[in-house]
C-alpha cells in the first residue's frame, strides 16, 4: 500500500471546476436542467463525502432530488464495513436496471469504500453493465472529470487504482443541514484492526492542516451552524503526520476558542490514543460537548489482542474512569462486536460485565462480519450463527435496560438543548450529550439553544417542557 499523501493543488481543483462548467454547458445545449440523486450508506465520513459529491453536481448544473427514479445521474456512495451493507448495495444496483430501462440515458456511479475493493470493481465490470462509473475514495476529488468522460466518451470509467491517500481543500459542499455540520479533520487509518477493511480502502492516516480546519469552522459558525462534528477514523491520531506539534486536544481547544454560540463533537476515538490531555481539554471548554464515543469492541483482553486493538480491558477502564472523573455528566457511547472468531462464552460474559460496570448511555452493537482481505476473515470461527444471535440479543437487552435506567434519571432535570426540527406536532431537540428530546413549542425556536425540563423518558428518547 502506498503510504504517501498527495496534496491536491489548486490548479488540479480548478481543472475539476472546468469540467463542472463543461458539464453545465452540455445541459444548456439540451435546454433543460438535469437532476441527480446521491444515495449514502455507512458512516458519517461517507455523509461528508456525499456533501462534496452533491456540491460538485450542483456546480455542474444539476438539481439534487431524493429518488433514483427520473434522475439523470445516480451516485451510490457505499460502505464496506459489513457484508450486509455490501449485499444491500448490490441488490439496489440490480434494481436500478429497471430504472435505467425506463431512462436509458441515466448515468449510474458507484463510489465509496466498496469501490476500493478489487473484487467489487471486477464484479461491477462483469455483472453490472448498466453501471457507468466506479471510483474509490482516493478519486472523489476527480468526480467532475469522471462524469464528463462518461457523458462525452460514452464508455465506462473505472478510477480504482491503488493511489496514495489525497487531501483536497476547496471542494464545494451541499450540506444536509444549516444547523449541523460534519468537518473532516483527517482521513484513513493506521491501526489495522484484524476485522476492519478501512485502512485498505481509505488508505493510511493523513491530517488536514489546522488552519484549513479552523477556516472551515469559522465559515460554518458565520453561516449559523450551531453543532459541528469533527470526523476521522481515529481523531486521536490527528496531527501525528504534521509538522508543528498540534495534536487533537490542541485542535479541539483552538476550535473551542472561536467566537460564537456552538457545540463541538467528534468521532471516532480509539482507546489506545485517548488520554488525560484529551479529557482535560473536553472538561475545560464549555463549547466541547460532554459526550464521548469510545469503542471498546470486546470486554475480553484476549479477544482485544486477537483484534489487534492495542489495549486491554484494564487500560480501557482506566481511560473511562478518568474521563468520568473530570466530566461527571459525561454521555458515553461505544461500539461492540459479538461473535468475533474464537470468542468463548466466558469471554462474551466479560463483555457483559464491562457494559454493566461502565453503564453506557448507548451502544452500537454488531455481529462479526468477515471482510475479505482482513486477517480475521481467515481465523477459525467455530461458534454457530444461532449462538452469535443469542449473544447479540442478550447484549442488546442488557444495554436497553441500562439506557432506559439512565434516561429515567433525567426526569425533573433541566437541560440545555439545540432545537433542530419537527416531529409531527412536536419540536425536536438534542441535548449536549446527543439525546433526542420532544417538546411543544413555536417553529421560531428551531436553530436556537433552549433550556428544557425533562418530564418523561423511554429507552430511546426524552420528552419535556420549555423551562
Model-derived segments and their meaning:
Residues 1-238, 277, 314-325, 356-357, ...:
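Proteins enriched for Cys/Gly/acidic motifs involved in redox and nucleic-acid/cofactor modification
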Residues 90-94, 210, 244-250, 312, ...:
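Charged helix-capping and loop-helix junction motifs
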Residues 193, 213, 230, 266, ...:
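Conserved, mostly hydrophobic/aromatic
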Residues 108-110, 118-119, 222-345, 356:
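Conserved SAM/AdoMet-binding glycine-rich loop
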Residues 176-179, 189-191, 288, 298, ...:
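Short flexible coil/turn linkers enriched for glycine and charged/polar residues
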Residues 80-81, 202-203, 242-245, 305-311, ...:
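Short glycine-enriched, charge-decorated loop/helix-capping segments at active-site entrances
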